[in-house]
Amino acid sequence: MTVKQSQASRLGPIFEACRDDDRAALIGYLPTGYPDVPTSVQAMVALVESGCDIVEVGVPYSDPGMDGPTIARATEAALHGGVRVRDTLAAVEAISAAGGRAVVMTYWNPVLRYGVDAFARDLAAAGGYGLITPDLIPDEAGQWLAASERHGLDRIFLVAPSSTPQRLALTVEASRGFVYAASTMGVTGARDAVSHAAPELVSRVREISDIPVGVGLGVRSREQAAQIGGYADGVIVGSALVSALGDGGLTALRALTEELAAGVRQRAAAS
């Protein structure tokens, strides 16, 4: 069975360019508002300047079911600081102005509160490429599917090792840009060992579609980035970048991003 993509992807040319360079794309996540709004925007621009191909701009949410402790603490601090959804849109504008490509990662409730079509409209106007929705499944995404078509945005849904063949096919068909493969079960966070379930999950997606696959949930080193970059189209890093920013500021964040960018260029074979 082959699952066809419905429309051209905004992110597609980025993955094509990375393939031409014989490497995976580096996709970095930071939450808006941590440690404060201005610094978070500077940090996202620093990701672009340090070799990040795509920036995931996080919308802090009070009930983050999938976030590990590092990101949960950062988003809690951002919420205490008064961060708003409009700050995320401003961050997207800043990334775009710096020559970067931004997607927003958000739980669905903030989008519902904002208004689905209004959010899609304003994200597109800010220069955003799409939306990652970790707690939204395609079956319940009718409003978002319609809004993404109207405003030309990519939609990135999650697949996991536990996804059934039917669920995998449905999710891949609804996705555009890339699919987000959770390389470990459970919440996000940097780990010493990268899940061995990830290569199999990527293979399962590739059996039914040529959509790019990004693998996340655990990467924190150049070696891990190289390992995942050997079989995935995108290497997604979140908790490790948040930790670097919190512990060492922009200098540490830049250093880690440069290390990870070197890692995806190593194309190490998956172990």
Curated annotation (Swiss-Prot):
Q: Does the keyword GTP-binding apply?
A: no
Class in the EC hierarchy, top level: lyase
**What residue stretch is flagged as signal peptide?**
none
Q: Pfam families from the entry?
A: Trp_syntA (PF00290)
Keywords of this entry: Amino-acid biosynthesis, Aromatic amino acid biosynthesis, Lyase, Tryptophan biosynthesis
What are its E.C. numbers?
4.2.1.20
Per its record, the protein catalyses: (1S,2R)-1-C-(indol-3-yl)glycerol 3-phosphate + L-serine = D-glyceraldehyde 3-phosphate + L-tryptophan + H2O
- Give TM regions: none
Cellular component terms per the entry's GO annotation: cytosol
Q: Domain of life, per the record?
A: Bacteria
Sequence similarity: Belongs to the TrpA family.
Q: Which PANTHER family match?
A: TRYPTOPHAN SYNTHASE ALPHA CHAIN, CHLOROPLASTIC (PTHR43406:SF1), TRYPTOPHAN SYNTHASE, ALPHA CHAIN (PTHR43406)
State what this protein does.
The alpha subunit is responsible for the aldol cleavage of indoleglycerol phosphate to indole and glyceraldehyde 3-phosphate.
- Quote the subunit structure annotation: Tetramer of two alpha and two beta chains.
What is the recorded name of this protein?
A: Tryptophan synthase alpha chain
Task: Give the organism, scientific name.
Answer: Mycobacterium avium (strain 104)
